[in-house]
Every structure is written in structure tokens, then in C-alpha cells.
């Protein structure tokens, strides 16, 4: 077996061990790291289009902080709540969970995202409210297009311990979208 495969197997084993021992912390760190990656991807695209622009490390770190402090822990407990009330691994329960997620959690999460990023950016309350008025609905509508399918797969086929990890991997693209929405003026 190649060294790369051995290394990947060891990393996977370590990650799964941490996920079982420290589920919230592991999901928080994973979310933070992947939000950093998402924003870095967006900035890479922006930099390739505008040579005068510079990489904004603080922006990427704000995304990482939000992923770490909000996304990982929030979805750990949210998915746990949904699993408690709809424990069957059935299409019916998956559909119920994704519907509740879209109607309850998604609007709140998108509000938290723009508010949290505004706070981390040092924006005033009025600026945050203006950002919410400008981008919240567009983001939520996009959320309703993207996430139901992902969450159906997540709730129907992914074991509960891996749901946040699966969401985080899918979230690389979504996080890039959020980073772009947040950086738009």
C-alpha cells in the first residue's frame, strides 16, 4: 500500500476516533476548517479575475470562526434533536426532517450567518439589518434549492454520527456561496 493511502487511512482513523470521543469539538473544528477553505476558494476566483485585489486573510478567518463557533455545534445539536423526534431511518422521516430543517433551521441559520459575520466584521446594527434586507431572502431561496436534496441524502443514508461531517463536505460549495454573498456590497 502506498504511503499516501496509509496516511489517509491513519488520518481517517484518527478523525473517526475524535468524532466519537469529542463529537462537538471535532465537528466545530471541521466546520471552521471547511469554511476557511470555502472562503479561500472564493477569494482565489476573485483574485484570478482582479489582479489588483489581495487575499483577505481576516475575511477567511472570520468565516472559519463562524464555522467553528456556530455551524459545527449548531448542527450537531440540531441533527441530534431531529433524530430524537424522528428516529427512523426511513424516507418518510428523512422527508419530515428535511422539511423541518428548511422551514425552521435554514431561515434562522441564514440570519445567524449574516448577523454573525456582520458582528465579526465590526459592522453597526444598522449595517447588519441592511445586509439582511439585501441578501437574506436571496440566500434563503437558494438554500431551498440546494439543501433539500443534500439533506434528504443526509437523513436517509448517512449515519447520525457522520451527518455533520457529510453536511460540512457539501458545505464547501455552499460556504463559498455564503462567502460570496457576504462579500457582495
Curated annotation (Swiss-Prot):
Main location per the UniProt record: membrane
Parts of the chain that traverse the membrane: 63-83, 100-120, 141-161
Localization (cell): Membrane
Listed name of the protein: PXMP2/4 family protein 4
Family from the record: Belongs to the peroxisomal membrane protein PXMP2/4 family.
GO cellular component, one term: cytoplasm
Claim: Transmembrane helix is one of the keywords in the record: yes
Taxonomic classification: Eukaryota, Amoebozoa, Evosea, Eumycetozoa, Dictyostelia
Protein topology in the membrane: Multi-pass membrane protein
InterPro entries per UniProt: Mpv17_PMP22
Keywords: Membrane, Transmembrane, Transmembrane helix
Domain of life, source organism: Eukaryota
